[in-house]
Amino acid sequence: MTTKVDIVNSGATRAEYIEVEPNVKLHISDGGEGRPIVLIHGWLLSDEMYEYQYNDLIKNKFRVIGITLRGFGKSDKPYGNYNYDVHALDIKRVLDILEINDAVLVGFSMGGAIAVRYLSIYSGAHVSKLVLAGAAVPLWTNRKDFPYNLNQSSVDDLIILNYTDRPKLLNYFARIFSATPTSLNKGIGNWLKGIGLSASSYATAHCLVALRDTDLREDLVKIKMATLIMHGKKDKICSFDLALQTNAGIANSQLVAFEESGHSLFLEESEKFNDELIKFAGK
């Protein structure tokens, strides 16, 4: 007996590249019909990281818009600033051009930090709900009054490694990306490293500086909209302490722990990740 496999219909054909400033175009994956869900990827990655989310979300009657940040994936890679404000402005311009309203904004890792800065600067323009997944929020590095996650000097070492042996940098993150070295199969690991190598070295380093230095604690208190925080309990890149601090910092937030996941909760527990996102976005 055979089981019929349904192919997801992505709906209308839309622009794959959007110009956010002269000579800078961002790669956009835009499919489906319904309430918009806007996906922002993490450091080193691109909108391709959400491959195992797109079909489920489109099938559940959402319009899914994956934005690849400048410097990464198939987007343009200009020299210049790569702080959170620049990325937030790029997102604003994409959503302006697409005339998006009532969106669910999803940010993974560094993408979560950029999503928080976006909402803080632009007062929630185009967006009605926020999802933070394994987010580098409110800080990625520790301070005297924030004793969590990495030392700033550890990030300096990563910046040096980026300039001297970028494949080694990617191999290091591949080893700590999941809960255990075998949580993701070798093929998935190679796929992620391939995406990572498509990033520019310049953007990779400058985004590490933004991750190292940016404090979003004052941004969090400006977020009033409903917020879903999803975070792996075994995350070695953005420790679970960050999720607890973020949950405490956003008044209207709920935290869902992924007990079996490291940083790659969207892959290690993809079914749960998609179900939680669909449930939250559909309310």
Question: Locations of the language-model features?
Answer:
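Flexible "cap/lid" loop of the alpha/beta hydrolase fold
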Residues: 116-121, 125-164
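Catalytic active-site module of serine/aspartate enzymes centered on a nucleophile-bearing elbow/loop
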Residues: 253-283
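Conserved acidic catalytic loop of the alpha/beta-hydrolase fold
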Residues: 86-103
